[in-house]
Swiss-Prot record:
This is Acetyl-coenzyme A carboxylase carboxyl transferase subunit alpha. Acetyl-CoA carboxylase is a heterohexamer composed of biotin carboxyl carrier protein (AccB), biotin carboxylase (AccC) and two subunits each of ACCase subunit alpha (AccA) and ACCase subunit beta (AccD). One of its GO terms (biological process) is malonyl-CoA biosynthetic process. Keywords: ATP-binding, Cytoplasm, Fatty acid biosynthesis, Fatty acid metabolism, Lipid biosynthesis, Lipid metabolism, Nucleotide-binding, Transferase. Its main location: cytoplasm. The gene is accA. NCBIfam families: accA (TIGR00513), AccA_sub (NF041504), PRK05724.1 (NF004344). It comes from Legionella pneumophila subsp. pneumophila (strain Philadelphia 1 / ATCC 33152 / DSM 7513).
Length: 317
């Protein structure tokens, strides 16, 4: 896979270019450059660790939006088996901005669904860049109710800039679809685990984000509005997005400190896109243990604990 580097990763990119140049030279003649390549690789790893240990909130937001960031389909392929996609809300359309269906996790049936932004231009347009419309949320709710009926746990992957704000979506009652999902998910009698893998934008994320366990990846973000949007409103200047990101507390660490999520999962060095297999492996182990624990909780107690979890958010002494 071709690597893409963000602006703050420029020193890492320069070192990688030197390493690749030495590899090409070494393959063209009999000069042994393995020691020099190994030295530069060690230096590159050290530099990467140093840069990523002190990222600013705005830089983390850029990581959450990285064009190579793993998407729902990447995790489905690596974590689950026997995935059978289910389409449509049975009222309007196939609803492709959210992908979902039945699968198996270690042989056990689960319902898995999540935002899908798309990777190439044609797919991005088809997926509406991962911005769900009312039909996507109604489709998601249909699948979750099916999971409840067949006693399957639900796993959701959240990665969206927000719910689609188009006229058509509003005409089809976007706010009602989101509100209905919030209400229904708080009462669905089956374990629900929600994972924020990239950016989680406001109600568009919450509509599939009410669960028994809420998990964020290390370089994911959760916010009521994008940093650019916040800066445009407060300072009438989108270029102040960095300042807005710092003030909003959108990073996984800050969200965890505020007790809005249950845990933060460390990513491979340089981000989840650097080693998708390892990231998926970590999530698979975590999902396995969390679902095993949740299945042992009586359903009535599970629903009460879920309700109390969200009612406690934002409470002050």
């Amino acid at each position: 896979m071709t690597r893409q580097f963000l602006e703050f990763e420029q020193p890492i990119e320069e070192l990688n270019q030197k390493i690749e140049a030495l590899r090409m030279v070494g393959s063209d003649n009999e000069v042994n450059l393995s020691e020099e390549i190994a030295r530069l690789e060690a230096k590159c790893s050290e530099l990467t660790e140093n840069i990523f240990s002190r990222l600013e909130p705005w830089q983390i937001a850029q990581m959450a939006r990285h064009p190579l960031r793993p998407q729902t389909t990447d995790y489905i392929e690596r974590i689950f088996t026997d995935f059978q996609e289910l389409h449509g809300d049975r009222s309007y359309s196939s609803a492709p901005a959210i992908i979902g269906g039945m699968a198996r996790l270690n042989g056990e049936p689960v319902m898995v669904l999540g935002h899908q932004k798309g990777k190439r231009t044609k797919e991005k347009v088809y997926r509406n860049f991962g911005m769900a419309r009312p039909e996507e949320y109604r489709k998601a709710l249909r699948l979750m109710r099916m999971a409840e009926k067949f006693k399957m746990p639900v796993v959701t992957f959240i990665d969206t800039a927000g719910a689609y704000p188009g006229i058509g979506a509003e005409e089809r009652n976007q706010s009602e679809a989101i509100a209905r999902n919030l209400f229904a998910m708080s009462r669905i009698k089956t374990p629900i685990v929600c994972i924020v893998t990239g950016e989680a934008g406001s109600g568009g994320a919450l509509a599939i984000g009410v669960g028994d366990k809420i998990i964020m990846l290390q370089f994911s973000i959760y916010s009521v509005i994008s940093p650019e949007g916040c800066a445009s409103i407060l300072w009438k200047d989108a270029s102040k997005a960095s300042e807005a990101a710092r003030a909003m507390g959108i990073t996984a660490d800050r969200i965890f400190e505020n007790e809005l999520v249950d845990m933060v999962v460390p990513e491979p060095l340089g981000g989840a896109h650097r080693d998708v297999d390892e990231m998926a492996s970590r999530l698979k182990r975590l999902l396995t243990s969390e679902l095993q624990a949740l299945k042992k909780v009586p359903l009535d107690q599970l629903i009460e604990l879920r309700y109390q979890k969200f009612m406690a958010m934002g409470a002050c002494d």
